[in-house]
């Protein structure tokens, strides 16, 4: 299926959401559940059909012999699950009884769960009764017919893309609430591009996993880099406190053939995976600025206190308990402590955390001195449905090269985005690659840079010459030597900046270092600002502004004189 055909299929399927919005007796923020459930049902149906000939052949070849095997056992081996006949999509779609359609869908999902214990409680069985309103009993049948149009020869991996497309559209339609379960795919893809997860016997944690998008994008990265043979050894561990979102995540992993566990729990108070020093990768987009976390329940937890403990705030009233007024640094500490000695992490965090003071500053200072923070990236505003302000990406690496131990790479990406609509932005594929190559160059991987330039040259010949030549120019203007260099307004490697004496006491702080900037991790403090139109230096810009202000004052005085003269002339002309 070509990209154009897939886009058309997604758009056609999205029509099902329009149908539900217009006629279903269901809250606006709930119609995603039945549609995502039908996507899974159609996925299971097509996947089973694609394996059924092999399943039947295996079963019939051994039937009646000493090696005879149960039919369901062969199904699980070849397909991953057994699909009972009542769950066949044709059986549901072809039923003439439109009023009973909801019951058929419910029974199909219940049968799938009964036959496949790992799916127990995952499918949204109970919502379909609301999709057969008395005034339009054929509503659900219309939606089912739309999903029947998915071709049965579709590449099964495309179901994951379809599911992700719907998650993204539902998140956009729900606005702020949508951001609680979905992180925009292009942001996640960039995060994955930086930490470069490797297949094999690796463990991957997301303690605020939402619908599981971090896991899915990591798996797709491995697929793009030809690591499918080892991908099934890669295991994901997610924690999510919202029951409905847990179901979304479990379906997402199944649709994308990702092995993992999703646990319903509150990560502040529960540690279902004993997550201290054991994970190869941690990625997450946790909720920002959470308050009212009970201080006594987290202050002695190793996940949160290795680098210092964020401050508790005493509540008001006789029985009030001490709480953490802002849990951002609980999350940040959690990600750092969950990593093993070679682990890497990427997380989305509120911009304010980069400069937070008090105990949070101490935690940040200790992390910086420990040499585990590799990179900080300021994102553009309007990249998320839940917040309009820019967020920051933190990248940890417990196994940084020795030459990087005393420095951090800062990237200011606030001006790198593609506008979706008035209120939303994203990264294009090329923007993800261009930002990712900065990290590759910082790591000394000049080969990756050359390969990207060559990729763009090939696409300039085959596809859009002007567009891909502009991408080449963007890279070569900033990195003309095909190696990393600081670029004003974009990226800068900054030293931690503490010079110690023989007794490990601080004897000097380097100018413009991180220590000199009060341990701030705000990229804007370091990368500087370039005036693209005139190329002026900061000093030249200040001088230009000074002379412009003097000119402004002169013009203002002239304007006042003219205003007085005009008023006088009008008065003489027309009288009082």
What are these regions, as identified by a protein language model?
Residues 1-202, 261-270, 378-381, 405-412, ...:
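Non-catalytic, mostly N-terminal accessory regions of nucleic-acid modification and defense proteins
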Residues 5, 9, 27-30, 139, ...:
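Helical mechanochemical/support elements of P-loop NTPase systems and associated helical scaffolds
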Residues 29-43, 191, 246, 250, ...:
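Conserved Class I SAM-dependent methyltransferase catalytic core
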Residues 133, 152, 238-242, 281, ...:
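Hydrophobic alpha-helical scaffolding
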Residues 141, 259-263, 302-305, 344-349, ...:
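Short acidic (Asp/Glu) and glycine-rich catalytic loops that position anionic groups and cofactors
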Residues 177-284, 288-301, 349-352, 356-364, ...:
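Conserved S-adenosyl-L-methionine
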Residues 288-291, 295, 299-325:
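Conserved catalytic motifs of ABC-family nucleotide-binding domains
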Residues 369-373, 383-447:
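C-terminal, active-site-flanking charged/polar segments
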């Amino acid at each position: 299926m070509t990209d154009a055909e897939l886009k058309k299929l997604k758009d056609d399927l999205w029509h099902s959401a329009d149908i539900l919005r217009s006629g279903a007796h269901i809250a606006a923020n709930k119609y995603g559940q039945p549609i995502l459930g039908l996507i899974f049902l159609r996925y299971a149906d097509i996947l089973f059909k694609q394996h059924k000939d092999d399943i039947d052949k295996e079963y019939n070849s051994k039937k009646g012999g000493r090696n005879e095997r149960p039919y369901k056992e062969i199904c699980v081996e070849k397909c991953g699950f057994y699909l009972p006949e009542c769950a066949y999509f044709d059986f549901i779609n072809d039923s003439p009884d439109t009023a009973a359609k909801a019951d058929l869908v419910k029974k199909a999902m219940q049968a799938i769960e009964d036959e496949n214990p790992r799916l127990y409680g995952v499918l949204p069985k109970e919502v379909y009764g609301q999709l057969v309103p008395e005034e339009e009993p054929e509503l659900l049948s219309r939606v089912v017919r739309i999903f029947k149009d998915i071709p049965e020869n579709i590449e099964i991996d495309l179901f994951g893309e379809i599911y992700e497309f719907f998650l993204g559209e539902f998140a956009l339609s729900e606005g702020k609430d949508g951001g609680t379960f979905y992180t925009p795919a292009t942001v996640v893809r960039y995060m994955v591009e930086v930490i470069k997860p490797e297949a094999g016997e690796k463990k991957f944690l997301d303690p605020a996993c939402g619908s599981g998008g971090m896991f899915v994008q990591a798996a797709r990265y491995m697929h793009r880099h030809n690591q499918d043979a080892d991908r099934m050894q890669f295991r994901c561990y997610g924690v999510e406190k919202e029951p409905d979102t847990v179901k979304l995540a479990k379906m997402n992993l199944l649709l994308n053939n990702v092995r993992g566990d999703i646990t319903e729990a509150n990560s502040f108070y529960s540690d279902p995976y004993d997550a201290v020093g054991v994970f190869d990768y941690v990625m997450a987009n946790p909720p920002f600025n959470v308050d009212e976390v009970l201080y006594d329940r987290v202050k002695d937890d190793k996940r949160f206190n290795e680098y210092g403990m964020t401050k508790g705030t005493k509540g008001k009233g006789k029985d009030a308990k001490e709480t953490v007024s802002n849990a951002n640094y609980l999350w940040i500490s959690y990600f750092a402590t969950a990593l093993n000695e070679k682990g890497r992490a990427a997380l989305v965090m509120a911009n304010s955390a980069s400069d937070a003071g008090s105990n949070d500053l101490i935690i940040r200072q200790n992390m910086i001195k420990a040499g585990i923070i590799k990179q900080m990236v300021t994102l553009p505003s309007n990249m998320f449905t839940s917040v309009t302000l820019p967020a920051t990406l933190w990248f940890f690496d417990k196994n940084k090269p020795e030459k990087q131990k005393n420095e951090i790479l800062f990237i200011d990406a606030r001006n790198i985005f593609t506008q979706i609509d008035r209120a939303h932005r994203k990264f294009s594929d090329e923007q993800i690659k261009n930002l990712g190559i900065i990290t590759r160059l910082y790591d000394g991987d000049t080969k990756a840079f050359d390969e990207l330039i060559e990729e763009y040259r090939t696409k300039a010949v085959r596809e859009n010459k002007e567009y891909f030549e502009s991408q080449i120019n963007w890279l070569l203007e900033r990195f003309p030597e095909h190696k990393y260099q600081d670029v004003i307004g974009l990226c800068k490697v900054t030293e931690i900046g503490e010079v110690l004496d023989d007794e490990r006491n601080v004897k000097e702080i380097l100018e413009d270092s991180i220590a000199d900037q009060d341990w701030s991790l705000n990229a804007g403090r370091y990368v500087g600002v370039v005036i693209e139109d005139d190329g002026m230096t900061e000093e030249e810009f200040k001088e230009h502004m000074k002379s412009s202000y003097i000119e402004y004052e002169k013009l203002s005085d002239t304007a006042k004189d003219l205003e007085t003269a005009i008023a006088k002339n009008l008065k003489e002309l027309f009288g009082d």
